[in-house]
């Protein structure tokens, strides 16, 4: 036996002793699927590594409870107090310590200085403190000389049912060690919480503050109570209430007419009979903290999964049968996954955060929601995403010396408890509902299914996902945050750019500083959209700096790599601009990604941690041969590093100036052009800079336009009328491949455009001609099919260039009249059109 365990233990020891200075994700992590047995072993060892944090965080109580039981508590910012921070932290960490003792012995290596006796002692003493300080037992007071928990509608505390659930799990893990008296205290606590659930109103609502999450945790306490005491005479009432809360967690308006019988094995109750009102918008999104919050969007699935888990695990372990079970706990979980989460899932399993976040970034807190759907709904997409997320949690833990899950936690030990809670639940769900026989989807086929541009109208968020990158932008009304970001289609490099919001804006837009004015933004036009396949165009308008400046902007997320940003900024009143910080992208300089970045730019290279702001003149910049920006602005800066929701973040300003500028009302402040690329080298970025052609010297006042290229040679035209009063005429620019054939008719090398204000015209093309006198147009805007007409007798032979998957293809043709040109089978096909 010892020989068999030795290789495993050596492997676990190596896993435990990785040091924080080592890079843990970029250039290290890959997307290979980890089998269930290995993942479960990793999850156990991750929790064992966390035991060092547990021991450091535990505090012995100065006095026992009133019946002489020794107790203690895991510390928080509110140690031993009766609030969420105090009670929830202790309950979660108690549960995790107890779990380790029950499930991990003989399978993991504990950190030096931590013993199984330590964990056993902490688990029991923290459980004693939890049940002793509840209002139902009153065996010991909390730090404020009071108690925690809910008893009835007349005496209740928000969220106490969630804390009670963790207490119940801790008790279950230690059930064989508890005396009958202690089990009685656990029962009194849980029955009191359930009494409140039986009396209270089931709340619903979706505007700004969904009740989905709250109803989910109310279902949890009913489930754990049922599972521990399934033969109690009150059990049928608990079960009925459990189903009501479950249906009204992910409740949707369509439920009112859903006459599906929930549990045919039990009775004929339908969804419609239990439905109280919607907690989700019509498109299955939700809001919490007054905005679209992807952490809350997913966590309800986790809560419902934890209820399913308790019913299965507790009842089968203690009583040998699952007396109580219900399909209500999976209600609409599949819909939320397919209609919302999958559209936001990134290459590392993270869910995109279009609005940024208001707690620690990159927690991968959706892992256990994926687990729920993988284990209980057998969802292959969820299984794949769970695998990615677990690997990222594992790697992030390596950035700490004490087994904590992350550095610079937003809420201290409480965050550690919540994260450990999720890791533990993921293990247990696989323990009771193995996925070993399932085949996960591969990420690239998954991405392709969810690649098309989508406007999430209820939240006013736009997104798409090409083979190169994910893009999103949000006009979140609740928190007045007008920002977005770009995530590379790469498991290890998609956190170079991070979600960021500040001063009502953030990534892409940035801000100006104006003397005597605040940095803020108020929307005038909250998104005019054009969607085409996996591409989108958005126009918007903001008044900024206490309505001193007007910024009209447009973003073209192309079907390829390039993301184009144009704007037109004017002064609304006389003012003094003291600083420009535009074209912003927040860049991680963090232990999780890279603590230093290498910046490549025109005639220069710099390695920096972003702490000091560095200014430089260059029409392009590349970060770590992975992310590039090109612009005609030539004035950039990088630095201003801050702790951005637990991730150290510097700022790349693609348009930067610290020079004072006095502006008159109506005067143009700037007409900026920036193009962003993902998964691109410095050399390619420099080449893209030479391909960028501005059209502003040809366009009327109030217009902005640019022609740019992708590394594969595809070209994109973007022309925006922001405030212009006249139509535009411009000459087709000559590129390195020739004169591009556009979606707009080109006559004699000139294009005429008429656009409304705050609108844009875009096209992508893979066809080029060598002579601007030819009349050209793409057929139905398709970049690979064109009509070309010769109208001059100057020459007979013309060259057509085409961008194909194999690269540039050329064809010289004898032109007479009009022809149809098409890229077909990686060749140029020419067909004469008879008039």
Give residue spans per PLM region:
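Extracellular polysaccharide-recognition and catalytic grooves
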Residues: 138-139, 150-172, 180-459
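Positively charged n-region of N-terminal signal peptides that target proteins for export
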Residues: 1-4
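Solvent-exposed beta-hairpin/edge-strand motifs
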Residues: 587-611, 732-747, 797, 802-807, ...
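Bacterial N-terminal signal peptides
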Residues: 7-15
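Extended polysaccharide-engagement surfaces of secreted carbohydrate-active enzymes
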Residues: 300, 306, 310-326, 346-729, ...
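C-terminal beta-strand-rich structural cap/linker in extracellular carbohydrate-active enzymes
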Residues: 661-686, 747-784, 815-835
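Sec/Tat signal peptide C-region and signal peptidase I cleavage site
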Residues: 16-20
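Low-complexity, Ser/Thr/Pro/Gly-enriched N-terminal "stalk/linker" regions
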Residues: 21-144, 256
């Amino acid at each position: 036996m010892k020989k068999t365990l030795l290789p495993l233990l050596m492997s676990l020891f190596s896993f435990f002793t990785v040091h924080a200075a080592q890079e843990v994700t970029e250039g290290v992590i890959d997307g290979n699927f980890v089998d269930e047995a290995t993942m479960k072993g990793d999850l156990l060892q991750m929790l064992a590594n966390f035991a060092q944090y547990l021991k450091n965080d535990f505090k012995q109580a100065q006095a026992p409870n009133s019946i002489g039981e020794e107790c203690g508590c895991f510390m928080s910012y509110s140690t031993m107090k009766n609030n969420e921070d105090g009670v929830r932290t202790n309950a979660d960490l108690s549960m995790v310590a107890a779990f380790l003792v029950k499930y991990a012995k003989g399978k993991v290596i504990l950190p030096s200085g931590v013993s199984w006796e330590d964990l056993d002692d902490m688990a029991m003493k923290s459980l004693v403190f939890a049940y002793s300080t509840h209002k139902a037992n009153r065996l010991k007071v909390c730090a404020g000389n009071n108690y925690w928990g809910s008893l009835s509608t007349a005496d209740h505390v928000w969220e106490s049912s969630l804390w009670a659930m963790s207490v119940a799990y801790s008790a279950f893990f230690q059930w064989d060690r508890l005396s009958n008296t202690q089990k009685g205290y656990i029962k009194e606590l849980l029955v009191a919480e359930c009494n409140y659930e039986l009396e209270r109103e089931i709340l619903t609502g979706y505007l700004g503050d969904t009740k989905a999450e709250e109803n989910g945790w109310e279902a949890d306490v009913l489930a754990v109570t049922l599972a521990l005491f399934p033969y109690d005479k009150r059990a049928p009432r608990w079960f009925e209430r459990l189903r009501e809360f479950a249906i009204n967690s992910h409740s949707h308006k369509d439920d009112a007419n859903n006459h599906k019988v929930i549990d045919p094995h039990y009775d004929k109750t339908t969804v419609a009979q239990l439905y109280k009102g919607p907690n989700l918008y019509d498109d299955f999104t939700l809001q919490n903290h007054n905005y679209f919050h992807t952490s809350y969007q997913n966590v309800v699935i986790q809560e419902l999964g934890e209820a399913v888990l308790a019913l299965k695990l507790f009842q089968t372990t203690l009583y040998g049968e699952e007396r109580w079970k219900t399909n209500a706990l999976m209600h609409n979980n599949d819909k939320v996954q397919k209609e919302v989460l999958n559209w936001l899932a990134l290459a590392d399993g993270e869910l995109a955060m279009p609005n940024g976040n208001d707690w620690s970034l990159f927690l991968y807190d959706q892992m256990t929601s994926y687990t729920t759907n993988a284990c209980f709904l057998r969802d292959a997409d969820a299984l794949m995403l769970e695998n990615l997320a677990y690997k990222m949690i594992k790697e992030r833990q390596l950035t700490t010396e004490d087994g904590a899950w992350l550095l610079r936690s937003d809420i201290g030990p409480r965050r550690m408890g919540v994260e450990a809670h999720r890791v533990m639940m993921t293990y247990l769900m696989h323990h009771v509902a193995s996925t070993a026989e399932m085949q996960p989807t591969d990420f690239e086929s998954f991405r392709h299914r969810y690649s098309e541009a989508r406007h999430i109208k209820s939240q006013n968020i736009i997104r798409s996902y090409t083979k190169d990158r994910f893009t999103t932008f949000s006009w979140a009304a609740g928190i007045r945050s007008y920002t977005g970001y770009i995530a590379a289609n790469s498991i290890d490099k998609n956190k170079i750019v991070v979600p960021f919001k500040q001063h009502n804006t953030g990534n892409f837009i940035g801000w100006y500083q104006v003397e005597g004015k605040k940095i803020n933004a108020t929307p005038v036009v909250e998104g005019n959209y054009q969607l085409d396949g996996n591409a989108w165009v958005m126009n918007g308008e903001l008044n900024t700096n206490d309505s001193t400046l007007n910024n009209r902007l447009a973003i073209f997320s192309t079907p390829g790599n390039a993301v184009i940003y144009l704007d037109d900024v004017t002064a609304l009143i006389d003012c003094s601009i003291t600083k420009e910080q535009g074209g912003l992208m927040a860049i991680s300089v963090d232990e999780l990604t890279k603590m230093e970045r290498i910046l490549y730019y025109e005639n220069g290279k710099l390695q920096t941690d972003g702490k000091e702001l560095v200014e430089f003149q260059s029409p392009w910049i590349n970060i770590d041969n992975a992310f590039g920006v090109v612009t005609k602005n030539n004035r950039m800066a990088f630095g201003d590093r801050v702790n951005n929701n637990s991730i150290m973040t510097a700022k790349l300003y693609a348009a930067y100036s610290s020079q004072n500028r006095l502006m008159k009302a109506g005067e143009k402040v700037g007409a900026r052009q920036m193009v962003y690329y993902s998964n691109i080298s410095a050399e390619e970025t420099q080449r893209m800079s030479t391909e960028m052609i501005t059209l502003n010297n040809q366009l009327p006042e109030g217009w902005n336009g640019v022609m740019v290229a992708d590394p594969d040679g595809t070209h994109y035209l973007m022309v925006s009328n922001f405030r212009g009063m006249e139509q535009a005429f411009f000459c087709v620019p000559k590129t390195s491949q020739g004169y591009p054939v556009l979606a707009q008719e080109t006559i004699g090398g000139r294009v005429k455009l008429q656009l409304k204000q705050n609108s844009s015209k875009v096209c992508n093309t893979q066809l080029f001609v060598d002579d601007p006198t030819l009349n050209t147009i793409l057929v139905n805007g398709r970049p690979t099919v064109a009509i070309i007409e010769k109208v001059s007798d100057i020459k007979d032979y013309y060259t057509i260039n085409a961008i194909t998957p194999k690269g540039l293809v050329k064809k010289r043709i004898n032109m007479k009249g009009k022809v149809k040109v098409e890229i077909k089978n990686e060749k140029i096909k020419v067909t004469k059109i008879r008039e």
